[in-house]
Each structure stands twice: as C-alpha cells, then as structure tokens.
Curated annotation (Swiss-Prot):
The lineage of its organism: Bacteria, Pseudomonadati, Thermodesulfobacteriota, Desulfovibrionia, Desulfovibrionales. It comes from Megalodesulfovibrio gigas (Desulfovibrio gigas). This is Desulforedoxin. Keywords: Electron transport, Iron, Metal-binding, Transport. Nonheme iron protein possibly involved in electron transport. Binds 2 irons ions per subunit via 4 cysteine residues per iron.
Length: 37
C-alpha cells in the first residue's frame, strides 16, 4: 500500500514518483514493481 508522501523509484529506468494520495495496489513501471525509497 502506498502512503501519502512516499517516494518510489523504478530500478530499470530510474523514474521517481511521489505519492500524493493514499491507495491500494502496487506501483509498477517497466513491468516491474517500483521500490520504496
């Protein structure tokens, strides 16, 4: 579950995202789960 303010990074392409609104599920980029920083 992604919480507001969390930062996630894709280990394949390096894209970084910051969560603005809490929600369920997983963040995915390039077909892989993103890693919480």
């Amino acid at each position: 579950m992604a919480n507001e303010g969390d930062v996630y990074k894709c280990e394949l392409c390096g894209q970084v995202v910051k969560v603005l609104e809490e929600g369920g599920g997983t963040l995915v980029c390039c077909g892989e789960d993103m890693v919480k920083q």
